[in-house]
Amino acid sequence: MAVIKMKPTSPGQRAVVKVTRDHLYKGEAFAALLEPQHQKSGRNNNGHITTRHKGGGHKHHYRVVDFKRNKDAIPAKVERIEYDPNRTAHIALVCYADGERRYIIAPRNLEVGATIVSGSEAPIRVGNTLPIRNIPVGSTIHCIELKPGAGAQIARSAGTSATLLAREGTYAQVRMRSGEVRRIHIECRATIGEVANEEHSLRQLGKAGVKRWMGIRPTVRGVAMNPIDHPHGGGEGRTGEGRHAVDPWGNLTKGYRTRNNKRTQVMIVSRRKK
């Protein structure tokens, strides 16, 4: 892949940096794996905003991606690599030997025509999915399960991966990109390699309208509001917050830890690095 800097033919094009998609399939998505996606625009059944800064955006179908990879010992051939508007990673359409087709998250360096397989006896090769107990220590992995059979939940976005550090009894230690080290059961599955489209982080949208196409609405600063709307609001002319930064409901927003999941706290060996 390559990065393209657009010519400054207009203010909206001046700062645009795109990632090429020349290697991606240019036809329609596989219809049997498409589902309608109804946009809620951040509203509940009463029409009240429950999630701010959402609404509008381009309509698109949801691609049903196989995160479980549970067709063991059946080889699958990669038919094409596709763009997915629902995620930063690319997806690959694979055809199993029994004729079934599924979408998977496309790993880096996975070529069209390659053969992948899942299961405990699968070879250590990019795109193959195995239980963590069968993966060599030090391997780069992605699409990692947190519970056996629940489907991949970790390292699914573009360019991400994790490293298998050690195995102790029925648990393994996995280091995330953030630096967090987490204990994961060795029966959980993971895929060899890292997620493709690693240059996604170099992309620059160039204008606010692109965010609107993505269904993201503007974020208004609290200091620009009236005091009835935000704790930072009010004042004559330009004024500062006058207090520690808080959200519209008065909760601290900077440097305040929000994690509150005691049930899985014991699975974290070391917290992420800032």
UniProtKB/Swiss-Prot annotation:
Q: What SUPFAM superfamilies has UniProt attached to this entry?
A: Nucleic acid-binding proteins (SSF50249), Translation proteins SH3-like domain (SSF50104)
Ranges of biased composition (kind: Basic and acidic residues): 229-246
GO-annotated cellular components: large ribosomal subunit
Biological processes, Gene Ontology terms: cytoplasmic translation
What segments bear the compositional bias annotation Basic residues? 50-60
The UniProt keywords, alphabetically, are:
Ribonucleoprotein, Ribosomal protein, RNA-binding, rRNA-binding
Entry-linked InterPro entries: NA-bd_OB-fold (IPR012340), Rib_uL2_dom2 (IPR014722), Ribosomal_uL2 (IPR002171), Ribosomal_uL2_bac/org-type (IPR005880), Ribosomal_uL2_C (IPR022669), Ribosomal_uL2_CS (IPR022671), Ribosomal_uL2_dom3 (IPR014726), Ribosomal_uL2_RNA-bd_dom (IPR022666)
Can you name one GO molecular function term for this protein? transferase activity
Q: Which domain of life is it from?
A: Bacteria
Q: Where is this region: Disordered?
A: 37-60, 224-252
Family in the record:
Belongs to the universal ribosomal protein uL2 family.
Its biological purpose is as follows: One of the primary rRNA binding proteins. Required for association of the 30S and 50S subunits to form the 70S ribosome, for tRNA binding and peptide bond formation. It has been suggested to have peptidyltransferase activity; this is somewhat controversial. Makes several contacts with the 16S rRNA in the 70S ribosome.
Self-association state and partner proteins as the record states? Part of the 50S ribosomal subunit. Forms a bridge to the 30S subunit in the 70S ribosome.
- NCBIfam families (UniProt xref): rplB_bact
- What's the protein name? Large ribosomal subunit protein uL2
Organism of origin is Paracidovorax citrulli (strain AAC00-1)
Organism lineage? Bacteria, Pseudomonadati, Pseudomonadota, Betaproteobacteria, Burkholderiales
